[in-house]
A protein has these predicted regions:
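Hydrophobic Val/Ile/Leu positions in short beta-strands of Rossmann-like dinucleotide-binding domains
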Residues: 11, 77, 117-119, 438
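Phosphate-binding loop of NTP-binding sites
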Residues: 25-31, 62-68, 79-222, 228-237, ...
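Short internal beta-strands
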Residues: 31-38, 220-224, 357-360, 382-392
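C-terminal helical cap/extension that packs against the catalytic core
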Residues: 50, 376-434
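Short acidic/histidine-rich motifs immediately flanking catalytic phosphotransfer sites
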Residues: 68-74, 163, 432-434
Length: 461
């Protein structure tokens, strides 16, 4: 596939965060860009204002004529789209050039040095942090991110001169096997997506295979203590990292007054007094990995210090919506038990003497079925849990799998309830809340503006 000869690109599942970065990339190249998504969102509306043509009905008559020329049209779809989708079927039956999002990402980044961040969790913040460090340094970078950077208001950064491309490497559907990393961080390998992989062993094997794709001359930066065994090619250097130990780690950690400072330690340097722009404890570990990537790519110590201090975070990743003396409200994308535990622990560290209320919308029936006890354990670290119905995404319901499974396994004595997401606002209006955390990867975050308004009126500080 020659990207240069393509005139039109059609996206099925245009509203996905990873898809939208590709949409912005092809718009920047002057291509005609159109597509379908199931529902309108703030992101799809933004893409329309940027030049994309997007519709929300599954209807081949709504596909623009420019996208019906199979010789000059590339069709991109996400694995979340059902195989029987009418538009996908039309393109298949008519012999169009059809690729998964991950395949296209692999093709367009193959000519650059890919700086990839893989792992069950932490990859969006770590990759966005690394992209910011490089973008504001003399090194520069292009970046395809899995979240909206608060520094830039987008999930795509472009550089005409830098050899580096920062990529969030997604293990879902083995998507990251299409990449050719120059360097890669692996943050975590807690089993997930067992609907795809079946077993923990298959999940870990997928990460092992991914490490074989790192190019000779490059590097693997592996979180210390992971179960997986890397299998890198000759000429690839393997480093370890974590918060407190490894080739890259933090020392002299200072947390207080809403600020975090660390010293970064590497085999060949030490950078003292780095301030975290988003001062939550999980970002110490994320920061160590991001700094390691930037350091190995040539960013100077001073550029790294300035970049870490000016990093503003990622939408829906420990995203403070409201903060005053009477109420704190934040949203976090955490949707795996290990992520939720880290998120709640980080909140607890910041607000030790306050009641922490978590609203959690489980994401996927299969994930809920596979991990409901682990979800209950992680959520039980809070003081109160409000569960909504499961967000299905690409899945059909599974008999007997509901939020009740998590509810029934929460620790004894915890305040808890289940409600429809439509009733969350009225429930919060009646409750006394001190610190509210909305967790999950579904659509509950769409209510964040209304929740913010309700709480700011109720607890005007």
């Amino acid at each position: 596939m020659n990207i240069e000869t393509i005139k039109s690109v059609y996206f099925i599942g245009a509203g996905g965060i990873g898809m939208s970065a590709l949409i912005r990339y092809f718009l920047s190249k002057g291509k005609k860009v159109a597509g379908y998504d199931r529902t309108s969102s703030e992101l799809t509306e933004r893409l329309i204002t940027e030049g994309a043509q997007i519709h929300y009905e599954e209807d081949i008559d709504l596909i623009p004529e420019e996208c019906k020329d199979k010789a000059s049209t590339l069709v991109v779809y996400t694995p979340a789209v059902p195989q029987g989708h009418a538009e996908l079927t039309y393109f298949r039956e008519n012999g169009f050039n059809i690729h998964k999002r991950s395949q296209v990402l692999g093709i367009i980044t193959r000519s650059s040095k890919g700086l990839c961040v893989a792992g069950t969790h932490g990859k969006t913040t770590t990759s966005t942090m690394a992209a910011h460090l490089l973008h504001q340094s003399h090194v520069g970078c292009t970046a395809f991110l899995g979240g909206i950077s608060k520094n830039y208001g987008t999930n795509l950064l472009l550089s005409a001169t830098s050899p580096y491309t920062v990529i969030e490497a997604d293990e879902f559907d083995r998507s990251f096997h299409w990449l050719s990393p120059w360097m890669s961080v692996i943050t975590a390998t807690d089993p997930d997506h067992l609907d795809i992989y079946g077993t923990k062993e298959a999940y870990l094997e997928s990460f092992r295979h991914y490490t074989t794709l790192i190019q000779p001359g490059g590097a693997l930066i592996l979180h210390k203590g992971l179960e997986m065994q890397p299998d890198v090619q000759p000429g690839v250097t393997t480093y370890t990292y974590s918060r407190n130990e490894g080739d890259f780690h933090a020392e002299n950690i200072r947390i207080g007054n809403g600020e975090i400072f660390i010293d970064f330690v590497a085999p060949d340097t030490r950078i003292n007094d780095i301030q975290l722009g988003v001062p939550v404890s999980i970002n110490i570990e994320n920061g160590v990995a991001a700094i390691a990537l930037a350091h190995l790519s040539g960013a100077t110590d001073e550029e790294i210090k300035q970049g870490m201090a000016s990093f503003r975070g990622v939408d829906r990743r420990f995203d403070f919506k409201l903060k005053n003396d009477r109420i704190v409200f934040l949203s976090d994308y955490a949707h795996h038990p290990a992520e939720i535990a880290q998120s709640v622990k980080s909140v607890r560290e910041l607000y030790q003497d306050k009641k922490i209320t978590v609203i959690f919308q489980p994401h996927l029936y299969t994930r809920t079925r596979d991990f409901y006890r682990d979800f209950a354990d992680s959520l039980s670290l809070s003081d109160e849990v409000i569960l909504t119905e499961i967000y299905p995404a690409r899945e059909q319901p599974i008999p007997g799998v509901t939020s009740q499974l998590i509810y029934d396994n929460l620790r004894p004595g915890i305040e808890k309830c289940i409600c429809r997401k439509e009733d969350v606002l009225s429930l919060l209006a009646q409750k006394h809340t001190e610190v509210l955390v909305v967790l999950g990867a579904g659509d509950l975050d769409n209510y964040a503006p209304q929740i913010t308004q309700l709480l700011s009126e109720k607890y005007h500080g």
